[in-house]
């Protein structure tokens, strides 16, 4: 049952409790102001007397360690105060990581590499945000690696990405997405091409771990890694691969004892595996809601948000100027493969794509590789464009791009199964 607070209402929170609310109705808007005390949203401190605005899709949990009064106005689908919160346990995880960082700083060694794992909808990206915010609040500069190609916390879906965190996330907009290191995958689940997924994770891990040596503060701050919610079968194998590629020293398992025990059995002895409860405020999302969330991230990539709008460009590219490729060829039986090649080699083969009307709405990644002779899989991407029209008569496509025409010279575009319907008005 929805609750509308047109004139607003004050909520008094005791210590170690949180105010939770959800907004599902389009065009709904909720304003929150911290009147007194101290409060935080996923590790970011709220500023007293400042109004924070939340819109459709927001699932908010404002926590206080010491007690506070919050003023809330607007239309919410759910709003309540809860004393049942795992925030103190999450703070203990931060304290343990901070001990690792202090030791690493003293010895000029690499700081902790911590993975957050668990099934879908248990709050993995939220825990990552909390741990990163707590780290920067005590002067650290950790790296954030996002391996969740389904939702994409840093880049749009279908990619893995890493970003340096230098300041706490904005309460309303999260972490700034400036200068991310992004690798193209092109599918919304690792199962779309398991061999390719492991390859891009290994490459990003290699580059990320090397980059730690370039800055002493980042080196000791370490890495927080967000992962996919696929934790059975091949999904579990991907988690083990990522833990090995990054040399994880800690794995935080959210809300699944079976996964916790499997990891205890399978990871090296020196790795700390910790079972944590999920927050009671975590909401299970339907397939439709996950799809909407992906669409919203892509829309924000091209158009920004009401607080920081972007104005993308639309221009034509002739087929002859379109150097378009896809990673992964159709599977062939071993008997049809060239001598010495295995079927899985086809999974990382770079193949040319001929433009057809089927290309419409697809996302294309702009690779830093300049030719197929380069290491295309191991090259990061500069950005993305979307095919909005295919004209077979004129032999041209229209693309939506954050940058004006033309495409950079020698640009190599990589096909993605992800689609974006550009109906922005």
UniProtKB/Swiss-Prot annotation:
Family membership: Belongs to the Clp1 family. Clp1 subfamily.
GO CC annotation: mRNA cleavage factor complex; tRNA-intron endonuclease complex
Key words of the record: ATP-binding, mRNA processing, Nucleotide-binding, Nucleus
Major localization class: nucleus
Organism: Drosophila ananassae (Fruit fly)
A Gene Ontology BP annotation from the UniProt entry: mRNA 3'-end processing
Compartment(s) where it occurs, according to its Swiss-Prot or TrEMBL record: Nucleus
InterPro entries, per database record: Clp1, Clp1/Grc3, Clp1_C, Clp1_C_sf, Clp1_N, Clp1_N_sf, CLP1_P, P-loop_NTPase
Protein known as: Protein CLP1 homolog
Its biological purpose: Required for endonucleolytic cleavage during polyadenylation-dependent pre-mRNA 3'-end formation.
Residues that bind ATP: 18, 59, 121-126
Keyword Transport part of the UniProt annotation: no
Intrachain disulfide bonds: none
GO molecular function, one term: polynucleotide 5'-hydroxyl-kinase activity
